[in-house]
Amino acid sequence: MDELKDIAIFTIGFKENVIMELEFRNKVVVVTGGANGIGKCIADEFRARGAEVYVIDKQEGDHFVGDISRKEILESFVAEIISRHLKVDYIINNALPMMKGIDECTYEEFQYALSVGVTAPFYLVKLLKPYLADGACIINISSSRDRMSQPQTESYTAAGRTCR
């Protein structure tokens, strides 16, 4: 029965009320943009269910602090993870570029948005690929703007659409 503890445990409620309890003990989770917002909620939920969670974010905090648009930062982040674990079970690409539109976004800012939203997720997965556990999962977070843009959010839309 102990081997079942490593498997997700589902508790089903009545009618439409389905409560799902998942256990992630001994799982390693990587979250980009996990210092606040959706990324923080994702990281907190995995931690609450027993996972070892590695967060990278530009915002200062109790996590790896760095700008994922920089290749050497991603390499250092992965080196830190791999020095402690030889496998990764989940990669959550959640970091978001700035949200600027065509009227105010410079060429350099647009390139930065693409680096955060496209290049960084690609390179992070490439670096971690040799360490992905059997059954590992990669989740790329996006928004509805990848299907229906709004004015003055073009940089965000372009970066989010590419990794969907």
What are these regions (language model features)?
Residues 22-53:
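Canonical Rossmann dinucleotide-binding motif of NAD(H)/NADP(H)-dependent dehydrogenases/reductases
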Residues 101-111:
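Substrate-binding pocket helix/loop in short-chain dehydrogenase/reductase
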Residues 94-99:
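Conserved NAD(P)H cofactor-binding loop of Rossmann-fold oxidoreductase domains
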